[in-house]
Amino acid sequence: MATPHIRAYRGKRIHMIGIGGSSMSGLAQMLLAQGYRLTGSDNLETYATRGLRDMGVPVTIGHCAENVHGAELVIYTVAILPDNPERVEAERLGLPTLERATLLGQLMEGSPVAIGVCGTHGKTSTTSMLAQALVVAGADPTVHIGGSLDFIGGSTRVGAGRVFLTEACEFNASFLHLRPTVAVVTNIDEDHLDFYHDIDDIQDAFRRFLKLLPKEGHAVGNGDDPRVTALLQELDCHTVTFGMGVCCDWRPVNLTYDARGCASFDASRHGKTLGHVTLRVGGFFHVYNALAAVACAWTQNADIEKVCEALSQFEGAHRRFERTGEIDGVQLYHDYGHNPAEMRNVLSVAKLQPHNRLWAVMQPHTYSRVKRLFQDYLTCTRDADITLVTDIYAAREKDPGDIKAIQLVEGMRANGLTAVHTPTFDDTEDYLRKHWQPGDLVLTMGCGNINQLNDQMNEHERAKEAGPM
């Protein structure tokens, strides 16, 4: 069966399986803005599913075959396995289906400037920074972010300009469905090892993505990452580098950090300062993200002073070291970081915030990732005073039976960390409430549903304050 094209289904009913996912919910909003009729389903009720329902999209919680009845096109993500009852029923009925990444590629078609931001870490923050910068600079871009940015009112923006900006996710090599004219590569590291054989296989996927660029296109890459620079040297298109190294095209000059880890620097190209950035988000990694945004905006002839002004106003994307509330004098934060490098990075920022004790609440994500990066998990929360570990979030995987969260906890203790296994959200909340003290900071981390623990604790606190009905 030929791959269906989304443009043939305007005015027809489209059903989206897993509509509450960070990318899928954004694509749903984009399709809705363009006049498509949508329904959707997800296995959990979340702020994303509630938000879509408020926009008029019928969303069913729970997957069942009947959900696809009456649909003329079914869209799914790679996280929705072939044995999902809705996918099974769509196949039985002979309904055309479209994978999320293919849909994104189709929506980008025809854009004179198609920017894909890829990398193992920092995609969402870099895309969000670049989106805000391009809007302020007057480019009026269409945007798709795998997260939510208040500045654009959510995860998508439909603009009237020449630019289509999106995250380009390397999981399952889905970014190969895109056709970028500009690519930004933040870094290349080990991840998604349930799909890739090893780091060389990962690098080769990025190679194939960059090879999609036309000769007149631009590749913007981290000049401090040897795997990224090696790929840039293979390209025939224009290349631009950013980083701390003296050989990078864009560098931060007069770089300083405030007490909370927020950087201030001059954005310098080939030794010439073109703007000044004072970030409101902490962490050395955000210097790289901001430089990537500046360098990419420069390829589009954007006013760099306006770009830097926009970056200085950037407040961060949701689920990226996001403060979610305060209970009993304890500050609650959440971050999407789900592999050891990301957890280590965000904890380096958390420890700079005023606090008594720092709690790290880790939801390990997928059995394959935990197995392949096991040793790195054992020390990545060393900056925390106490680490709580929930059960592993399976996501798209089935439990192999040979890896458990308690093994992580035992390994952490062997490495001198204070670690506790709290299997469920109820277990975790109960432990926190019994042991936290005013002035503590609690950071939950993971890309599964661990953010719902923050929601749960806040809801319970509001109910307690309201008293008995």
Regions found by a protein language model. Give the residues of each.
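C-terminal helical cap/extension that packs against the catalytic core
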Residues: 378-438
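Short internal beta-strands
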Residues: 36-43, 219-223, 359-363, 384-394
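Beta-strand->loop->alpha-helix junctions that form or flank phosphate-binding loops
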Residues: 41-42, 60-63, 98-105, 144-147, ...
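N-terminal leader/targeting and accessory segments in enzymes
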Residues: 1-103, 226, 248, 282, ...
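Phosphate-binding loop of NTP-binding sites
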Residues: 5-7, 30-33, 53, 67, ...
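Nucleotide phosphate-binding/pyrophosphate-handling subdomain across enzymes
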Residues: 3-15, 23, 27-34, 111, ...
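Structural beta-sheet core signal
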Residues: 16, 40, 143, 183, ...
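Conserved hydrophobic helix-helix packing surfaces used for dimerization/oligomerization
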Residues: 14-16, 74, 115, 141, ...
